[in-house]
Amino acid sequence: MKLSCLLLTLAIIFVLTIVHAPNVKAKALADPESDAVGFADAVGEADPFDITKLNIKKLTKATCKVISKGASMCKVLFDKKKQE
């Protein structure tokens, strides 16, 4: 049961990371009337992110809240399973 709680917590962190990641747009730079040997380039543009504006305290608090809620949910499930 402890392993599944760890996996659940990691899955939640993974999903939150994907949701809060900056948007990346890919654009094809090809001639519209190109032949079958034409080329395509993908250009990614991300929002600028300044690491100095990152509030570590808020980020740490939010991460701890998510992990503690996940742990408490796992504890409740584990206790229910133990009673059965």
Swiss-Prot record:
One of its GO terms (biological process) is defense response to bacterium. It holds the Pfam family Pilosulin. It comes from the Eukaryota. Shows activity against E.coli and S.aureus (MIC<6.25 uM), moderate activity against P.aeruginosa (MIC<25 uM), weak activity against B.subtilis (MIC<50 uM), and has no effect against L.garvieae, C.albicans, and S.cerevisiae. Has no hemolytic nor cytolytic activity. Causes an IgE-independent histamine release. This is M-myrmeciitoxin-Mb2a. GO terms for cellular component: extracellular region. InterPro entries: Pilosulin. Keywords: Antibiotic, Antimicrobial, Secreted, Signal. Transmembrane segments: none annotated.
